[in-house]
Amino acid sequence: HWMVRRQRQMCIRDSDSTPFYGESGGQVGDKGKLSAKGLEIEVLDTQKIGNFHLHISKIKKGSINLNDRVKAEINTERRRAIVSNHSATHLMHSALRNILGEHVQQKGSLVNEEKLRFDFSHKQKLSESEIARIEQEVNQAITSAEDTQIIETSIEESQKLGAIAFFGEKYGDQVRVLKIAGDYSTELCGGTHVKNSSEIKSFKIISETSISSGVRRIEAISGDLAIKDKADNKTDLLN
């Protein structure tokens, strides 16, 4: 269904069947375009409300009516960067638990095309050595080049698989288990992810701070941005 607000400026599309990912689970919504003969619509954001997706859009050319058919195209380059950062978040979560201890629990996250942000329970500042070990573990998992496995199962079966569930999250009878880099990371997640861990390419932590008592925040980058950052820093060290 289409709802049009301020003709040629804004339209919102409700749909439970769309290639656009609606913002949820810390992952930002997709951008892209919708088109038809004589019609161009820029999708500025996608939000998820219940089973519906709201496509917040700007009509650039033409007009749209109820039941018009359109071609939907997401911004694939942007999605690719988001997917890389989301999968890297899962790998980093596993590395944090392996290196710092199982007391580490996710307290919040944000995944967009530029970086990942992950808040977690831990009482003290991470040392340079711990940060280096986390980066090393994540990059080793990336180079394992394992295919991502998606398992639709019951919450009980997911627990038997060792999947990490998040306190306070509401789960239905059926859940989606994501296994990234083999058995290295197993979590419940409804987001979009790489098909193979090698697609992440590289991982680099760019900051680690305290945001409240007992909660730390890591910001990191992956993919080509991480490769460029490492190359730039290597050049700096040589000069």
Per-region residue spans from a language model:
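Conserved catalytic alpha/beta cores of large enzymes that bind or transform nucleotide phosphates
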Residues: 33-149, 224-228, 233-239
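Divalent metal-coordination and catalytic microenvironments
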Residues: 25, 90, 118, 177, ...
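Non-catalytic interaction/regulatory segments
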Residues: 114, 120-211
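Single conserved hydrophobic/aromatic residue that forms the stacking wall/gate
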Residues: 1-12
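Terminal appendage regions of diverse proteins
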Residues: 103, 197-239
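A structural micro-motif recognizing beta-strand termini
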Residues: 15-20, 57-62, 180-183
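Short helix/loop capping segments that flank catalytic or ligand/cofactor-binding pockets
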Residues: 21-24, 31, 82, 128-129, ...
